[in-house]
Amino acid sequence: MRYVKVGSDGSGGSRFEEVEVGQVETAYTENTPPVLVSRVIPATGLAWVTLPPDVRETGWHPPPRRQFVVILEGEFELETTDGHKRRFQPGAALLIDDLDGQGHVTRVLTGGAASFLAIPLAE
């Protein structure tokens, strides 16, 4: 299992990175067969975020905090300062961690509202 990290490059820019999620076989709950489970990442909350139909692009921005994002509705494109662009559809998980510098651009590629879960991290 993987997620995409949008991180700072150390010189005020941002870049994409593929991150492998380590999992171990665990009896996750009683009376069920073992499943693969990752370590728990401490979070401080959860917010549903919706970009209304008239918001198609954000411009360059850093995130408000270090957070995981899970796409719920719509197709998003993120662009990093190194010129790379990636598209993300519902179900995609991203770690948005480019707190330093210019950040990234977010675009909505589909019509209508687009939404994601923002999960601020405690660490």
State what each model feature region is.
Residues P62, F68-Q89:
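A short beta-strand-loop-beta hairpin characteristic of the jelly-roll/cupin
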Residues M1-S8:
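Short acidic, Pro/Gly- and aromatic-enriched capping/linker segments at domain boundaries
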Residues W60-P62, H104:
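Histidine-centered active-site/metal-ligand motif
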Residues A27, R86, Q102-V108:
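Short, Lys/Arg- and Gly-enriched loop/turn segments at beta-strand edges
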Residues A93-L99, V105, L109-E123:
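A short hydrophobic beta-strand segment most commonly corresponding to one strand
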Residues G13-W60, A114-F116, A122:
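A short glycine-rich, His/Asp/Glu-containing loop-to-beta-strand
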